[in-house]
Design a protein with these regions (language model features):
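Exposed, interaction-prone extracellular/peripheral surfaces
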Residues: 1-217
């Protein structure tokens, strides 16, 4: 999450998006909590709506990540244990983890009755692999150096990225999760618009189900 080619990192974008959504939901009178994680949960603020809580949340988001490898499985298991009431869970991550690890991790949240909205944060260079000269690439999470010819590996890279993205979206459809891709050169207002549309669509689905249930009673 520490990679960035647009003047700021994916982590910076994700924290700003989380702060924006937290401020918006708090302004609506909703209780808002926070989890930050890499290979484990780093910060946990239970959902609350009281004086000073939003400031605590913003201060927690200002802390820089450790840069270690992201692992969704252990943190999301812990999150599902800590959330006591059903509610809205917004997950913001680059999701660059094996697809077969994502479904059980996300499934714990939906199985508990939570509404889940997922933002996959990617840098534009990760989508296009817009490099042209052979060079050393550093995996910013594992810190491994790899000497690669971008033109030679671009087709294979893009094929694997497309397969990974399709796998993530299929998992979200199966679990009833609203999925959005947030590219870091995209204005945050558009991500907020995606969030609002997700909530609006969810409300329509719930109302339709309620109406059908009432008619059959």
């Amino acid at each position: 999450m520490e990679y960035g080619s647009v003047g700021y990192s994916k982590s910076d974008y994700a924290r700003t998006l989380a702060a924006t959504l937290g401020w918006f939901l708090n302004g609506q009178g909703d209780a808002v909590g926070l989890f930050t994680f890499d290979a484990e949960v780093r910060e946990y603020l239970p959902a609350r709506h009281r004086h000073g809580h939003l400031r605590q949340l913003m201060l927690a988001l200002e802390k820089q990540g450790g840069g270690s490898e992201t692992n969704l499985n252990a943190p999301l298991r812990r999150v599902s244990e800590l959330i006591r009431k059903r509610g809205l869970v917004v997950l913001i991550s680059d999701l660059l983890a094996p697809v077969n690890e994502l479904e059980p991790s996300l499934g714990r949240l939906t199985a508990a009755g939570n509404e889940v909205i997922l933002f996959q944060v990617l840098d534009p260079n990760e989508l296009n692999f817009d490099f042209h000269n052979a060079m050393l690439f550093q995996d910013v999470e594992s810190e491994r150096d790899l000497y690669l010819d971008p033109d030679a590996i671009r087709p294979e890279y893009q094929r694997k990225l497309a397969e990974h993205s399709e796998g993530v979206e299929n998992i979200c459809r199966r679990l009833g999760i609203s999925f959005h891709r947030a590219v870091t050169n995209r204005p945050l207002e558009l991500a907020l618009s995606d969030f609002l549309r997700s909530r609006g669509s969810r409300g329509k689905i719930v109302r339709r189900r309620a109406q059908r249930g009432g008619a059959g009673a």
